[in-house]
Amino acid sequence: MIYGVGVDIVNIERVERILSKNKEGFVKRVLSEYEQVLFAKKGDSSTYCAKRFSAKEAFAKALGIGIGKIVSFQDLTICNNKQGNPYFIFSAKLCLYLVDKNIKKAHLSLSDEKFNAMAFVILEIEN
């Protein structure tokens, strides 16, 4: 059964401007430590950051809360499996919250094109 759905879209040029002004601050605030390591290796860093920002916002929307109340950007890490499909890794704190809400699965889809990055999240609970 679906617990919640969240979607978010981010303008990549906006993220690019933020990175040009305060790269270190934005990266430390939005990306987990693991994501920061991958970010350092990326050629298209603004798209990478925009997709992660969008995914974390969409996740918070699917929970029905905003970033900062229960979940922070640091509580979520976005990884990719061998086929390139994105998935979430949760902090221990967030895992406890999800268990309390009976949320068993999180589905994530990411997309980008020239100007925008988008994320779509579905959270499932057990019947």
Swiss-Prot record:
Mg(2+) binds at residues 8, 57. SUPFAM superfamilies: 4'-phosphopantetheinyl transferase (SSF56214). GO terms for biological process: fatty acid biosynthetic process. Keywords: Cytoplasm, Fatty acid biosynthesis, Fatty acid metabolism, Lipid biosynthesis, Lipid metabolism, Magnesium, Metal-binding, Transferase. InterPro entries: 4-PPantetheinyl_Trfase_dom (IPR008278), 4-PPantetheinyl_Trfase_dom_sf (IPR037143), ACPS (IPR002582), Ppantetheine-prot_Trfase_dom (IPR004568). Gene3D superfamilies: 4'-phosphopantetheinyl transferase domain (3.90.470.20). HAMAP family: AcpS. Transfers the 4'-phosphopantetheine moiety from coenzyme A to a Ser of acyl-carrier-protein. This is Holo-[acyl-carrier-protein] synthase. The lineage of its organism: Bacteria, Pseudomonadati, Pseudomonadota, Gammaproteobacteria, Candidatus Pseudothioglobaceae.
